[in-house]
């Protein structure tokens, strides 16, 4: 009989808990394990410490048996298996019944949770539960007689495949924004509901304008979907652990003091922090409540004296975390946030809240209590984005290990792919295994994009058993992957020719490479934004009437989110200048629908442009240092399209890759690496 089949012995568990002097009883442990199962990023058995520290072997065994038994009742991490099988039309019908009971004619179901983040825990996956759509951006609107699912161009095919198109209209949220659709679809005199925890004030006002055009009204309500989602997973309870100063490079006390002083200079008494990555950075803590990003879900209030109120479920704090946080950090239950906001409001002092990331509920609560709101960006955003020397040294080390893992994979791929038997999932699994063997590895930084042939042309493709292809000769294989290490976060893309590429593939690849090199070599004055640099990466494609429909670069955290603001390189307007210490991706691409995709991505860090030439210039200049290390496929390079400066850059980059990674890989891989990084035109 397996551990999953063994019914836990509550009496024995109670005895083991008492013997270990645990503060929990069996019911408390069961509730804790339910939260552990709802946390997708728990690694190993470190959660045992939440029960007893140290954990006696017999208790650890009992806890593992309990976890296995409870996990067997879950389906896809979303809900117990019996309810997960409830047909989605029935879910929609139940939601409509709940709307009628509340006197609502419609309800808005966004993809995000109360933190407005990219990754959402199982308990927050309302859109996926209702519609079946699992993409990273989308929104549904349910009316009495109609329902629509809004996605952007990346996800139209996926939405049509995952959602029931007999009940959900699939709409393009750029061509037809949801608020505009509501203006034509909401019933006159009707009431449309929204959950104020799940929308920013700006989003609410857009919906309000659409609803009022239809002669209807928009009301904040308790979420009716939560009422019909039976056996909804609990909030995740991944262990929250200290992030050592040896990796962070600055103590939490110093960060709190620095940011508190900045608030005081602005005449602000306190800032409400709603982004878990900001709180994790500020307090030097990490967790695992959401996929691929080491975040503990929480809220916080930072005051100008540097003190912090942290609103978090204490059950997930590992022993000793109180000492790490210090006396100036007060740990409060999540339900204490509302009263704390009331107290801030009644003090009469100015309270800073970020209108771009904070939930409408936060603003409503402060305003109802008479608060003076200062609308400004999260005070942690910019300091977090500008990495300190310790963080930069760490990310360089992480990129060396990550580059060695990817290079081992590429050498293995060169041997295996020509057989035509290797699948997309098998390839990504092998790459993950190489990464997991590396020091300080904690997780992937996002689901690997492993796309062969036409699947590579799907920008946010994710291989499934139903969609995956074999990686075969005459294909291009696009591999976009990354990892979370204690000392840094990585994200790198390589496009590999399987066999001999055709002339069109080489032309398009080389134009993408020219754009990548142009951005990597860019010198630009202080004050330059990513928007101003975006054309560097596109020029060679534009010359042939080609382009790509995604941004050129996104910010990256330090053992935090692989997508970090406020910096980015994109056509979209962005007023944030690039500053020294900011890490950003350099990832131009080209995609031929139904045929292949090409993307070349390295992470770079903004640095001062030093040297004699710099001293002679009238303005302070900046440049990029490339962090990512892995060969770029030379077989795809059309040498005649590169000028001498571009060839010199590629050869110098490959020399650096070879010299850095050779000591980190095995002999067979080293031989392959030597050939893969040989000077262009030498063979």
Annotate each language-model stretch with its function.
Residues 1-80, 84:
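Domain-length accessory/inserted modules outside core catalytic folds
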């Amino acid at each position: 009989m397996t551990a999953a089949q063994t019914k836990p012995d509550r009496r024995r568990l109670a005895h083991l808990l008492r013997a270990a002097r645990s503060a929990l009883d069996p019911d408390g442990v069961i509730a804790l394990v339910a939260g552990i199962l709802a946390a997708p990023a728990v690694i190993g058995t470190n959660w045992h410490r939440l029960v007893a520290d140290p954990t006696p072997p017999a208790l650890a065994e009992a806890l593992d048996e309990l976890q296995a038994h409870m996990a067997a009742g879950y389906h896809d991490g979303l809900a117990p298996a019996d309810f997960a099988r409830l047909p989605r039309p029935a879910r929609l019908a139940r939601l409509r019944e709940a709307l009628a009971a509340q006197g609502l004619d419609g309800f808005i179901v966004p993809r995000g949770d109360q933190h407005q983040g990219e990754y959402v825990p199982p308990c927050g996956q309302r859109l996926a539960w209702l519609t079946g759509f699992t993409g990273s951006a989308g929104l549904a609107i349910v009316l009495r007689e109609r329902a629509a699912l809004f996605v952007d161009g990346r996800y139209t095919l996926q939405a049509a495949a995952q959602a029931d198109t007999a009940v959900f209209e699939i709409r393009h949220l750029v061509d037809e924004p949801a608020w505009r659709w509501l203006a034509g679809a909401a019933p006159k005199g009707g009431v449309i509901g929204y959950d104020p925890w799940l929308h920013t004030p700006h989003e609410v006002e857009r919906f309000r304008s659409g609803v009022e055009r239809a002669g209807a009204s928009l009301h904040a309500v308790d979420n009716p979907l939560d009422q019909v989602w039976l056996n909804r997973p609990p909030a995740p309870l991944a262990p929250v652990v200290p992030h050592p100063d040896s990796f962070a490079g600055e103590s939490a006390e110093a960060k709190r003091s620095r940011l508190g002083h900045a608030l005081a200079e602005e005449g602000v008494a306190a800032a409400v922090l709603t982004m878990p990555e900001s709180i994790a950075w500020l307090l030097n803590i990490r967790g695992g409540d959401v996929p691929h990003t080491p975040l503990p879900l929480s809220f916080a209030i930072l005051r100008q004296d540097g003190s912090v109120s942290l609103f978090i479920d204490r059950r997930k704090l590992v022993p000793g975390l109180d000492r790490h946080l210090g006396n100036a950090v007060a740990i409060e239950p999540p339900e204490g946030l509302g009263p704390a906001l009331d107290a801030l409001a009644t003090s009469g002092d100015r309270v800073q809240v970020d209108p771009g990331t904070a939930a409408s509920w936060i603003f409503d609560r402060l305003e109802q209590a008479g608060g003076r709101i200062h609308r400004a960006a999260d005070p942690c955003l910019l300091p977090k984005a500008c990495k300190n020397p310790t963080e930069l040294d760490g990310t360089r080390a992480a990129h060396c290990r990550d580059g060695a893992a990817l290079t081992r994979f590429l050498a293995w791929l060169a041997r295996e792919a020509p057989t035509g038997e290797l699948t997309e999932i098998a390839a990504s699994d092998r790459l993950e295994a190489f990464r997991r063997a590396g020091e300080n590895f904690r997780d992937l930084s996002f689901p690997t994009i492993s796309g062969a042939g036409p699947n590579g042309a799907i920008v946010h493709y994710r291989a499934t058993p139903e969609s995956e292809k074999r990686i075969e000769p005459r294909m291009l294989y696009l591999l976009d992957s990354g990892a979370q290490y204690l000392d840094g976060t990585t994200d790198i893309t390589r496009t590999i020719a399987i066999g001999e590429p055709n002339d069109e593939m080489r032309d398009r690849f080389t134009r993408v490479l020219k754009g990548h090199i142009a951005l990597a070599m860019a010198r630009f004055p202080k004050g330059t934004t990513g928007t101003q640099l975006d054309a560097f990466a596109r020029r060679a494609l534009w010359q042939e009437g080609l382009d790509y429909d995604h941004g050129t670069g996104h910010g990256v955290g330090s053992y935090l989110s692989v997508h970090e603001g406020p910096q980015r390189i994109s056509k979209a307007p962005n007023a944030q200048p690039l500053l020294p210490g900011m890490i950003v991706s350099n990832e131009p691409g080209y995609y031929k629908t139904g045929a292949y995709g090409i993307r070349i991505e390295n992470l770079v860090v903004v640095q001062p442009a030093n040297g004699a030439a710099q001293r002679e210039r009238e303005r302070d200049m900046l440049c990029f240092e490339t962090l990512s290390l892995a060969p770029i496929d030379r077989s795809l390079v059309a040498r005649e399209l590169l000028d001498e400066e571009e060839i010199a850059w590629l050869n110098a980059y490959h020399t650096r890759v070879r010299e850095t990674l050779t000591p980190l890989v095995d002999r067979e891989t080293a031989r392959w690496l030597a050939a893969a990084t040989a000077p262009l035109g030498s063979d």
